[in-house]
Amino acid sequence: MYVVSTKQMLNNAQRGGYAVPAFNIHNLETMQVVVETAASMHAPVIIAGTPGTFTHAGTENLMALVSAMAKQYHHPLAIHLDHHTKFDDIAQKVRSGVRSVMIDASHLPFAQNISRVKEVVDFCHRFDVSVEAELGQLGGQEDDVQVNEADAFYTNPAQAREFAEATGIDSLAVAIGTAHGMYASAPALDFSRLENIRQWVNLPLVLHGASGLSTKDIQQTIKLGICKINVATELKNAFSQALKNYLTEHPEATDPRDYLQSAKSAMRDVVSKVIADCGCEGRA
C-alpha cells in the first residue's frame, strides 16, 4: 500500500490545483532527506531516478529502500523511472515493482515518438503502471543525454492532443522554455503556450528542468495546469557545495556520518522550499 502509482497522485493534484514534486535521487542521503521532509510536511512526493541512478544503486536495492522508508514513515511514495528510453529496460523494472514510468522518445520524429510511447503504454497499463511521455525537447543535460539549445524545441499545443490521444499516456511532459541544469539567468517561460496546451489536453502536465526557477514562475505554471515538478540539479548542487564547504573548513574530517550531515541539511532546505512552492504541504 505504500509504494504507489503516480496516476492518483497527479489526478489529485490536478483537481486540487497544486503540483507534486519529483525529486531525482542519487544516493541514500538524498532519499532520506526527501522522504523525511515530505513526511514531516505531510506532502506527496515522487522518488525519481534516471537510468544512471538505477545502474548505480541497483533496481532491487532502490525498490527495497523506497518500500522500507514508506513503511517506516507511514507515507505513500511513488518510485518513478525518469528519462528512460529502452523498452526492455523499462519492462524489466516494471516487473521488479516500479509503478511509474517516463518513456522519453522526444528526440524522435513525431510519428516515431507516438509509436515508441504507445508500445510502452500498452505494456505498462497491463501492470497498472502510469506512463509519462514528452512532446518537445528541453535543452541541457540529463544523465548521459546532452541536448544543445539549438536542437531544443517547444511543445506544439495541437500536436499535444493528437499525441495524448494516440498514445494513451497518463501525463504529458511539456517544453515551454525550461532546460535541464541550473540557469545562468532567469529563463523566459512561454506561459501562453502552456495555457494553450492546457486547452487542448486534459491530462496532468509535467514540467522538467525546474531547478532554479523562481517561486513565482513555478506557481504560475501550476495555475496553468502543471501537476508535477521535476527537480534534480538543485539537489545535487546543494549536496556537493555544502560537502565541499564542510571539508574545506574541516580538512581533518574522515567520518561520512559526520561530514554528510551538512550536505543533508542543505538538501533539506531545497526540498522544503520546493514542496512549499508546489503548494502540496498537507496534501498526502
From Swiss-Prot:
Record keywords: Galactitol metabolism, Lyase, Metal-binding, Zinc
List the PANTHER family hit by this protein, alphabetically: D-TAGATOSE-1,6-BISPHOSPHATE ALDOLASE (PTHR30304), D-TAGATOSE-1,6-BISPHOSPHATE ALDOLASE SUBUNIT GATY-RELATED (PTHR30304:SF0)
Q: What is its EC number?
A: 4.1.2.40
InterPro entries the record matches: Aldolase_TIM, Class_II_FBP_aldolase, FBA_II, TagBP_ald_KbaY/GatY, TagBP_aldolase_GatY
Provide GO CC annotations from the record. cytosol
Encoding gene per record? gatY
Question: What cofactor is needed?
Answer: Zn(2+)
Quote the protein name from its UniProt record.
D-tagatose-1,6-bisphosphate aldolase subunit GatY
Q: How does it assemble?
A: Forms a complex with GatZ.
Q: Give me the comment on cofactor binding.
A: Binds 1 zinc ion per subunit.
User: What chemistry does it catalyse, as a reaction equation?
Assistant: D-tagatofuranose 1,6-bisphosphate = D-glyceraldehyde 3-phosphate + dihydroxyacetone phosphate
State what this protein does: Catalytic subunit of the tagatose-1,6-bisphosphate aldolase GatYZ, which catalyzes the reversible aldol condensation of dihydroxyacetone phosphate (DHAP or glycerone-phosphate) with glyceraldehyde 3-phosphate (G3P) to produce tagatose 1,6-bisphosphate (TBP). Requires GatZ subunit for full activity and stability. Is involved in the catabolism of galactitol.
Q: What class of enzyme is it?
A: lyase
Do you know which SUPFAM superfamilies this protein is assigned to? Aldolase
Pathway given in the UniProt record: Carbohydrate metabolism; D-tagatose 6-phosphate degradation; D-glyceraldehyde 3-phosphate and glycerone phosphate from D-tagatose 6-phosphate: step 2/2
Question: Which residues does UniProt mark as catalytic?
Answer: 82 (proton donor)
